[in-house]
Amino acid sequence: MRCVQVRESELGDADAIAHVQVETWRAAYRGIVPDMYLDDMDVSERAERWRQRSTEHRSTWVAECDSKVVGFVAFGACRDGDVSAAVGELHAIYVLPDRWRRGAGRALHDRCVAELGGCGFDEATLWALDANPGAKAFYEALGWEADGATVPHDFAGTEMILVRYRRSL
């Protein structure tokens, strides 16, 4: 059943957003990112980070089903130094595992793309773990293409590669 409503997040959503982030990371990245890193993720610590981020220049939207936050997307200006000011960035998009393939991810993605375009961005980027074929397939199905840029990222002492994706808005 699809019951997804997408709305701009509020400060009071920080706990729910953090819960989504931790649960999704543990489900999506188990076997990819070191277990120690995933097991050490703390919802209350993440919630405090989300409360602090509410003052940053980026937007966060949530997907709800039956008044429960089941996913979120965060986006804003691109943080990469090698792109123009006309490029936005999808910073994060996560949906609770029991809501995967039910439309919440696509609804959040589509809101992100519409909002970035409405802010005057011509293109957008995002970074995905190279070792995460599920995420890469999701993005590619929505029109994103790897642009050749990669960066290493350390997860609890394990170096992983992030791949940059790009799409026109």
Regions of interest found by a model, annotated:
Residues E8-G12, H19-D98, R106-R111, E115, ...:
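Acetyl-CoA-dependent GNAT
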Residues T60, A86-G88, D122-K136, E140-L169:
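C-terminal "cap" of GNAT-fold acetyltransferases
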Residues L11-A14, N132-P133:
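Alpha-helix N-cap/helix-start and coil->helix boundary motif
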Residues R102:
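Flexible nucleotide-binding loop
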Residues R2-Q5:
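Extreme N-terminal starter segment of soluble prokaryotic enzymes
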